[in-house]
């Protein structure tokens, strides 16, 4: 129910989604076949579990709500979303909270979000422009309308055009890019990313009759270099980001909590004011501090190296790395999964 992911500590006390997006990460968590959203524990219990989690740090740990088990704005789910946010906000917490949706956001929803006083809430509105219902059955018009509603009604609540998944030959045409450019005018920032082409997702799409989207599966998201180049050229001078936390940080006028400034080539498209913010907070930690956090994460490692780009460990899990990374605002990598220069943490597919 609570798990650390790259963009934050993920709380999922409602499970089940009827939207049936073929590429959904719920395939990886064995809950894709749960179509009816159901409550696992009460909102109050969920919040208590979250704030007492060993990795939670008040005002620091980024939080995600319902990002791997349902869509937070579905009927019957959004009441739990808002109640959870209100319970956290009432505690005076100033943590960043990420809410990802491809469903309908109404003016009344935004009005309730705007009443929050402490949390830094970001709504990431997923749009792909994919028209093949076997891959994505949800009408992309919902995302367009939600972005407009947020643009017209939100001030404190920030909106991201979450342009994903970009897939070669499916939704990477010049027309798709032009449509994304129009939508970006309604958002505080745009984040673009590729496809998780894992075995579970490929199997589901094959069973739906979809020809393999890529010739191979990959641990990391696939976004070929040619697509990235066309997107970054089209968005030149606009607030476009490769990484979710970078877009979220820009929208709120803060430095990236994932410390990606160390991996400088990621920042070559970032607006200058954002680069300056991240420059000021990029502080190389000492080994003793990393060892202290590793112990809290129950990570046994005598092989810590730190340079100006990142901390490098061995034998770590993603959850252990993300906890250290978010606590220090400094990139943490494992030697068994090297980050190659210029790949921006993506799969090698399309970069060979």
Name each model feature, range by range.
Residues 1-122, 316, 323, 327-352:
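Conserved Radical SAM active-site core
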Residues 45-228:
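Conserved AdoMet/S-adenosylmethionine-binding subsite of the radical SAM
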Residues 202-352:
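C-terminal accessory extensions appended to soluble enzyme cores
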Residues 19-22, 181, 229, 233:
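A broad, structural surface signal
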Residues 26-29, 71, 166, 236, ...:
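Residue-level marker of positions within ordered structural domains that often coincide
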Residues 42, 175, 284-288:
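Alpha-helix capping and helix-coil boundary motifs
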């Amino acid at each position: 129910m609570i798990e650390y992911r790259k963009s934050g500590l993920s709380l999922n006390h409602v499970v089940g989604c009827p939207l049936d997006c073929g590429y959904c990460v719920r395939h990886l968590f064995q809950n894709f076949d749960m179509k009816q959203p159901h409550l696992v524990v009460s909102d109050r219990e969920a919040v208590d579990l979250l704030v007492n989690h060993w990795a939670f740090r008040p005002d620091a740990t980024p939080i995600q709500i319902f990002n791997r088990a349902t869509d937070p704005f579905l009927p019957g789910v959004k009441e739990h979303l808002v109640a959870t946010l209100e319970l956290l906000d009432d505690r005076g917490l100033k943590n960043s909270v990420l809410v990802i949706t491809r469903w309908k956001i109404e003016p009344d929803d935004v009005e309730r979000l705007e009443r929050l006083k402490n949390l830094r809430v970001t709504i990431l509105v997923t749009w792909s422009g994919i028209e093949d219902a076997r891959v994505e059955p949800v009408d992309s018009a919902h995302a367009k309308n939600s972005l407009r509603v947020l643009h017209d009604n939100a001030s404190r609540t920030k909106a991201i055009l979450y342009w994903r998944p970009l897939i070669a030959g499916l939704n990477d045409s010049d027309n798709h890019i032009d449509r994304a450019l129009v939508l970006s005018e309604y958002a505080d920032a745009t984040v673009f990313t590729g496809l998780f082409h894992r075995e579970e997702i490929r199997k589901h799409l094959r069973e739906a009759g979809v020809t393999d989207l890529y010739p191979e599966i990959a641990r990391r998201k696939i976004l070929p270099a040619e697509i990235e180049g066309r997107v970054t050229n089209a968005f030149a001078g606009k607030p476009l980001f490769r990484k979710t936390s970078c877009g979220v940080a820009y929208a709120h006028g803060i430095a990236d909590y994932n410390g990606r400034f160390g991996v400088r080539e990621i920042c070559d498209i970032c607006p200058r004011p954002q680069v300056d913010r991240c420059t000021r907070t990029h502080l190389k930690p000492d080994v003793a501090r990393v060892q202290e956090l590793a112990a809290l994460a129950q990570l046994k490692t005598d092989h810590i190296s730190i340079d100006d780009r990142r901390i490098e460990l061995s034998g770590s899990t993603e959850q252990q790395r993300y906890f250290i990374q978010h606590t220090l605002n400094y990139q943490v990598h494992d030697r068994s999964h090297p980050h190659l220069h210029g790949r921006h943490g993506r799969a090698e597919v399309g970069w060979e």
